[in-house]
């Protein structure tokens, strides 16, 4: 998967189209990413009491994962781009590059 944790992405389809956010978590086995402030859902949690007597629960708003095909990585220029790879000559490792301008990400 070409999108990693910490990347800034732009949502290109769905109800949050046009929103930018940071990837909080990536799920490569499911091809999904958790983006900050995108795909917010309301989750109903059971009311529980802690040892100090505080009660928690009710309706909680949180982010839900979104499919990786619905986001594009934003490059250093602030524009969405596709991702490619090149092999670094010194280390021999793959480095992600922007297809739009050819710079490293």
Curated annotation (Swiss-Prot):
Complex and partners: Part of the 50S ribosomal subunit.
Gene: rplX
Gene3D superfamilies the record matches: 2.30.30.30
Entry keyword annotation includes Aminoacyl-tRNA synthetase: no
Primary role: One of two assembly initiator proteins, it binds directly to the 5'-end of the 23S rRNA, where it nucleates assembly of the 50S subunit.
Family label: Belongs to the universal ribosomal protein uL24 family.
HAMAP family: Ribosomal_uL24_B
Protein's UniProt name: Large ribosomal subunit protein uL24
GO CC terms in record: ribonucleoprotein complex; ribosome
Keyword Transcription regulation recorded: no
Key words, A-Z: Ribonucleoprotein, Ribosomal protein, RNA-binding, rRNA-binding
Organism: Mycobacterium tuberculosis (strain ATCC 25177 / H37Ra)
Single GO MF descriptor: structural constituent of ribosome
Residue stretches spanning the membrane: none
PANTHER family: MITOCHONDRIAL RIBOSOMAL PROTEIN L24
GO biological process per UniProt: translation
A Pfam family: KOW
């Amino acid at each position: 998967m070409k999108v990693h944790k910490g990347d800034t992405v732009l949502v290109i389809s769905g109800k949050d189209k046009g929103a930018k956010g940071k990837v909080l978590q990536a799920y490569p086995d499911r091809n999904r990413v958790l983006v900050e402030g995108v795909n917010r859902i309301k989750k109903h949690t059971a009311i529980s009491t802690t040892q100090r007597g505080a009660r928690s629960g009710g309706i909680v708003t949180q982010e839900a994962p979104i499919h990786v095909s619905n986001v594009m990585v934003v490059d250093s220029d602030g524009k969405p781009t596709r991702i490619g790879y090149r092999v670094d000559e010194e280390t021999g490792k793959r480095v992600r590059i922007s297809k739009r301008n050819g710079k490293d990400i």
